[in-house]
Structure formats: structure tokens, C-alpha cells
């Protein structure tokens, strides 16, 4: 299991410019991530997704996020997320631990 505090720092550094996590949080360039786990791709209410995201059809969980966050454009070709990915597995594990905690409160 990852370190939630380390994951929070990674989120602030690499994700928070485009995403929020709190319930009722606003969409920015990217969607609010509250309720992410167990939700299908392209389903955050009120956010305009690419067809690539809507049509991917996977459900977000630890395994799918682990693969996606390594290389988003490879996992969902056509996504508009402008992010190169996180190559270090330990950083992805920490970020996912934080997201699992923060998006469910």
C-alpha cells in the first residue's frame, strides 16, 4: 500500500493544476476526481470528455490507474490529458493511495 502523505505531495505537484478531489469540487482543465474509484472512464458529471475517454469503457481502480498514470496517451489514445505520466512505480502507488483516500471523503 502506498503512502498517502507522499501521494498528496505528488498530487499537489503534478495533478492539482488541472484536477480537484473534494466532493462538489469544480472541474478545471481536467475533471473533479471525487468518486473516481469504481467509475467508468469519461463519466464525471458536467465535464466534456473526448470520445476516446468516453469509449474506453474501463472502470477506474488501482490496477487501471497504475497503468494509465504511467503513460496516459498510450492507455487512452486520443485523451486530451496533457501529462507525460509518472514512470516511477512507487510514486504511482503513493498517488493512488492518496486518490483512493481523498476522492472518497
Swiss-Prot record:
The keyword Metal-binding applies. The keyword Acetylation applies. GO terms for biological process: mitochondrial electron transport, cytochrome c to oxygen; mitochondrial electron transport, ubiquinol to cytochrome c. It is found in: Mitochondrion intermembrane space. Binds 1 heme c group covalently per subunit. Gene3D superfamilies: Cytochrome c-like domain. Its main location: mitochondrion. The modification N-acetylglycine is found at residue 2. Heme c binds at residues 15, 18-19, 81. InterPro entries: Cyt_c-like_dom, Cyt_c-like_dom_sf, Cyt_c_1A/1B. GO terms for cellular component: cytoplasm; mitochondrial intermembrane space; mitochondrion. Keywords: Acetylation, Electron transport, Heme, Iron, Metal-binding, Mitochondrion, Respiratory chain, Transport. One of its GO terms (molecular function) is electron transfer activity. It holds the Pfam family Cytochrom_C. Belongs to the cytochrome c family. Electron carrier protein. The oxidized form of the cytochrome c heme group can accept an electron from the heme group of the cytochrome c1 subunit of cytochrome reductase. Cytochrome c then transfers this electron to the cytochrome oxidase complex, the final protein carrier in the mitochondrial electron-transport chain. This is Cytochrome c. It comes from Gallus gallus (Chicken). The lineage of its organism: Eukaryota, Metazoa, Chordata, Craniata, Vertebrata.
Amino acid at each position: 500500500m502506498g503512502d498517502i502523505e507522499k501521494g498528496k505531495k505528488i498530487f499537489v505537484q503534478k495533478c492539482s493544476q488541472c484536477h480537484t478531489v473534494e466532493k462538489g469540487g469544480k472541474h478545471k482543465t481536467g475533471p473533479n476526481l471525487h468518486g473516481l474509484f469504481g467509475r467508468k472512464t469519461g463519466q464525471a458529471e458536467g465535464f466534456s470528455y473526448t470520445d476516446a475517454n468516453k469509449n474506453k469503457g474501463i472502470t477506474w481502480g488501482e490496477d487501471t490507474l497504475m497503468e494509465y498514470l504511467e503513460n496516459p496517451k498510450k492507455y487512452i489514445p486520443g485523451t486530451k490529458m496533457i501529462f507525460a505520466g509518472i514512470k516511477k512505480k512507487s510514486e504511482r502507488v503513493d498517488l493512488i493511495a492518496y486518490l483512493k483516500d481523498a476522492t472518497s471523503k
